[in-house]
Amino acid sequence: MRIANTVNDSIVDGHGLRFTIFTQGCPHHCPGCHNPDTHDPAGGREVSLEELMAEMGRNPLIEGVTLSGGEPFAQAADCAALAQAAHARGLNVWTYSGYLFEHLRDSGNPDWTALLAQTDVLVDGPYVEALRDLELDFRGSSNQRVLDRAAIEALRPVEA
């Protein structure tokens, strides 16, 4: 898996204390992106699932894992495997994506389907600078949605 960075004690990337992984590579290139250094798929560094799980295990207080970016769905198979391993440790998984839920759901891409199945909360949609709102929880712009497990399992978006 190619990543830009990790944060082992985030409180801004989902509920509770989180281990956040910033994946490397993003096709969206949203103007005003908070993480433009994650766009280049050749940037960052290569890490194994075992390395990430070991790093995650160093903080016994974390409640969940957040997959951010970059675009996690650009490395969906690796992210799904990591999410499954996190669930095995009793951690919840939040995934941020510049894609809309409907696009991910309808894509027919089995790796995307696998990552959706391992995601407890999906924050979807591209960052839109004109819709930036600092008052929003866990989102940068008002077009983005926070979709919970029920919405994902029902295959229809419901604001969480």
Mark where each language-model region is.
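Conserved Radical SAM active-site core
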Residues: 2-4, 17-18, 35-114
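N-terminal pre-triad scaffold of radical SAM enzymes
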Residues: 2-29
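Domain-level signature for proteins that mediate thiol-based redox and metal-cofactor handling
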Residues: 8-12, 50, 132, 138-139
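Conserved C-terminal portion of the radical SAM core fold
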Residues: 59-66, 123-129, 153-159
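P-loop/Walker A phosphate-binding loop and immediately adjacent motor/lid segment at beta-alpha junctions
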Residues: 75-89, 94, 132-160
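Short, conserved loop/helix-junction motifs that constitute active-site signature segments
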Residues: 113-117, 140
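Well-ordered beta-strand positions
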Residues: 119-121
